[in-house]
């Protein structure tokens, strides 16, 4: 999805479905392995946090704080790993490494994107159940794509720093 939304932000692609399925096909194997790794890490973080919650007062609090930091780092990597996969050709190891380094290096953008991802939770604070259900339905239909599109504006700015500029043919000197 990020492959298409980043192209949309740059006004580069006219065929949304064709581009989506092309990128899906190209990245399927790596994305599946990344999904499994991220799932395993999420389960381990969840289990460790629960175990820390059942420990003694001081030790449990310290471990919960440590796992909260690891969870934040996990979410930051999760935010970047799929856009990095969609934009760059890397090994899985380098995709994770680059996602982590970019998330840390561009911390203000990272936190803005996290806020964008968390904003839909505001739906649950709307007092009317009927409005909540309508908004939840809209979010299920359009939410992930809208969030990806909004975050893609930031990813384009971030990734442009890592992509070498091609010389403009008009600016290049013609040798006689």
Explain the meaning of each model-derived region.
Residues 1-176:
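Hydrophobic alpha-helical membrane segments
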């Amino acid at each position: 999805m990020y492959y298409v939304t980043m192209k949309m932000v740059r006004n580069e692609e006219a065929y949304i479905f064709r581009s989506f399925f092309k990128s899906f096909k190209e990245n399927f194997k790596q994305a599946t392995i990344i999904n499994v790794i991220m799932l395993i890490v999420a389960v381990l973080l969840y289990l460790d946090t629960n175990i820390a919650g059942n420990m003694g007062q001081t030790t449990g609090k310290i471990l919960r704080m440590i796992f909260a930091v690891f969870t934040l780092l996990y979410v930051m990597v999760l935010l970047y790993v799929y856009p990095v996969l969609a934009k760059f050709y890397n090994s899985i190891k380098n995709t994770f490494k680059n996602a982590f380094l970019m998330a840390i290096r561009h911390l203000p953008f990272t936190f803005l994107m996290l806020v964008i991802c968390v904003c839909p939770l505001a739906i649950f604070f709307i007092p009317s159940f009927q409005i909540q259900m309508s908004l939840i339905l809209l979010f299920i239909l359009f939410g992930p794509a809208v969030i990806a599109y909004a975050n893609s504006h930031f990813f384009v700015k971030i990734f442009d720093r890592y992509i070498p500029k091609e010389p403009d043919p008009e600016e290049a000197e013609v040798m006689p």
